């Protein structure tokens, strides 16, 4: 059972994948967004290639727990992904995932240019990792 983690942004979608047992998350790729149809096709290819059975999408919340300004866009994307793949995505609180990813990359002394290339993939990995940890305890 592999789980796909997505960090959906305006320009890029960070993608992470779990191992077969659903215990660990690894960054997989970054999809540079062009159109909804092409984005969905790219994700579907990944789902089919890796035999993904579950999809987790980072859900943008404000620090007080309310839905963030991008929440409706992410919900709309999730609905379209469900229609396209038949897999109903699970939402996972992504508060501070990008901030945490940035801190990890800075602490690893990664240059700003390199950080821009991998931050979305790392954010997706953190989202997926949080979800997998939760599932393993419940």
From Swiss-Prot:
CDD domains: YqgF. It is found in: Cytoplasm. GO terms for cellular component: cytosol. This is Putative pre-16S rRNA nuclease. GO terms for molecular function: nuclease activity. Keywords: Cytoplasm, Hydrolase, Nuclease, Ribosome biogenesis. Pfam families: RuvX. The keyword Cytoplasm applies. Its EC number is 3.1.-.-. The keyword Cytoplasm applies. Signal peptide: none annotated. PANTHER family: POLYNUCLEOTIDYL TRANSFERASE, RIBONUCLEASE H-LIKE SUPERFAMILY PROTEIN. It is an enzyme of class 3 (hydrolase). It comes from Carboxydothermus hydrogenoformans (strain ATCC BAA-161 / DSM 6008 / Z-2901). Could be a nuclease involved in processing of the 5'-end of pre-16S rRNA. One of its GO terms (biological process) is rRNA 5'-end processing. Its main location: cytoplasm. Belongs to the YqgF nuclease family.
């Amino acid at each position: 059972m592999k789980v796909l983690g997505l960090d959906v942004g305006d320009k890029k979608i960070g993608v992470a994948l779990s191992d077969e047992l659903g215990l660990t998350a690894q960054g997989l790729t970054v999809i540079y967004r062009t159109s909804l149809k092409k984005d969905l096709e790219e994700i579907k290819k990944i789902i089919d290639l890796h035999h993904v059975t579950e999809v987790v999408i980072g859900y943008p919340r404000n620090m007080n727990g309310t839905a963030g300004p991008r929440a409706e866009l992410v919900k709309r994307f999730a609905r379209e992904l469900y229609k396209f793949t038949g897999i109903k995505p699970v939402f996972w609180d992504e508060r501070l995932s990008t901030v945490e990813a940035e801190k990890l990359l800075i602490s690893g002394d990664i240059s700003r240019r390199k950080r821009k290339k991998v931050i979305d993939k790392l954010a997706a990995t953190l989202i997926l990792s949080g979800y997998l940890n939760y599932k393993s305890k419940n």
